[in-house]
């Protein structure tokens, strides 16, 4: 089966964020991209274009990001580099995707659908904490179990202290320098759709909330409008979850999968039944080096 016979997903983890660079658990905290992260996104776009040109296939026709700004900034840079105009739209379980894609707002513009189901795993009370500090507190075995095991789960977040409050926010005086955005303000569409947002997650729970989106939105849309490819910008855990579902990776083996920042991974699926065909990084050497750096996070000294 050749490249032109398959449906292609260009999947990547967002470029480096401000908290990535500080070795801090980010989770649902809305960290911005660093200049390095923006550079990674531009390089990703060039790799995608080179691949499409060399295989005589079209550039992606639709994009997907999480609701967190670091994926949206990564997508913005990629599409700007590719010369593609785009329109962002938040989707929930109440969204009729087919009707939305026929909306005139997308005429001459690539749709980019944003969903919380692509958000990073919610790291609970670990969010905003330095990884070496958590390693020291929990010890190597428990740290690696919670961080890497399919069922490992951090303690729940205290949203009264670790989320920006809508009124009378106390800032860092609560003991937390980095907080996730106020949910009522950030996730209004999800609140209206009665989506249940987590306060801590295992990778297993990320898979559960992401799988319906993959099947009912990404693959269903590809089938209905005969797409050749799409681009998905996610996070370490949401990309691992996509791989687990698409490739059928076991619960045991998924703990050994590490996702580097800003390097496109191509997943090819059979057009007839969307079964897995193959996967490969567009920059395999860099992916290998940077994936090992991800695995080693927390074992370095504090900056």
Swiss-Prot record:
InterPro entries: His_Pase_superF_clade-1, His_PPase_superfam, PG/BPGM_mutase_AS, Phosphogly_mut1. Pathway: Carbohydrate degradation; glycolysis; pyruvate from D-glyceraldehyde 3-phosphate: step 3/5. The keyword Amino-acid biosynthesis does not apply. Coiled coil: none annotated. PROSITE patterns: PG_MUTASE. The keyword Isomerase applies. Substrate binds at residues 13-20, 26-27, 70, 120-123, 131, 147-148, 236-237. Residues 177-198 have a biased composition (Basic and acidic residues). Belongs to the phosphoglycerate mutase family. BPG-dependent PGAM subfamily. This is Phosphoglycerate mutase 3. It comes from Saccharomyces cerevisiae (strain ATCC 204508 / S288c).
């Amino acid at each position: 089966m050749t490249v032109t016979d398959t449906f292609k997903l260009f999947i990547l983890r967002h470029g480096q964020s401000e908290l990535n660079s500080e070795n801090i658990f980010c989770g649902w905290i809305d960290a911005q991209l660093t200049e390095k992260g923006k550079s990674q996104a531009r390089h990703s776009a060039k790799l995608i274009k080179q691949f499409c040109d060399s295989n005589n296939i079209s550039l992606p026709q639709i994009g997907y990001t999480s609701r967190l700004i670091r994926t949206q900034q990564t997508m913005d840079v990629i599409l700007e580099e590719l010369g593609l105009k785009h329109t962002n739209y938040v989707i929930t379980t109440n969204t009729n995707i087919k009707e939305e894609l026929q909306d005139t707002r997308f005429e001459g513009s690539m749709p980019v659908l944003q969903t919380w189901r692509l958000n990073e795993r919610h790291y609970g009370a670990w969010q905003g904490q330095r990884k070496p500090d958590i390693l020291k507190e929990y010890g190597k075995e428990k740290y690696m179990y919670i961080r890497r095991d399919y069922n490992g789960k951090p303690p729940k977040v205290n949203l009264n202290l670790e989320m920006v409050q809508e009124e009378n926010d106390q800032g860092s005086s609560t003991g937390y320098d980095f907080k996730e955005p106020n949910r009522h303000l950030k996730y209004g569409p999800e609140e209206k759709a009665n989506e249940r947002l987590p306060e801590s997650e295992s990778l297993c729970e990320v898979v559960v909330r992401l799988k319906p989106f993959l099947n009912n939105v990404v693959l269903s849309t590809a089938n209905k409008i005969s797409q050749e490819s799409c681009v998905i910008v996610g996070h370490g855990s949401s990309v691992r979850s996509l791989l687990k579902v698409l490739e059928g990776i076991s619960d045991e083996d998924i703990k050994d999968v590490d996702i580097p920042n800003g390097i496109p991974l191509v997943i090819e699926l059979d057009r007839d039944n969307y079964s897995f065909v193959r996967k490969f990084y567009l920059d395999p050497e860099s992916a290998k080096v940077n994936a090992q750096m991800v695995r080693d996070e927390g074992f370095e000294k504090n900056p």
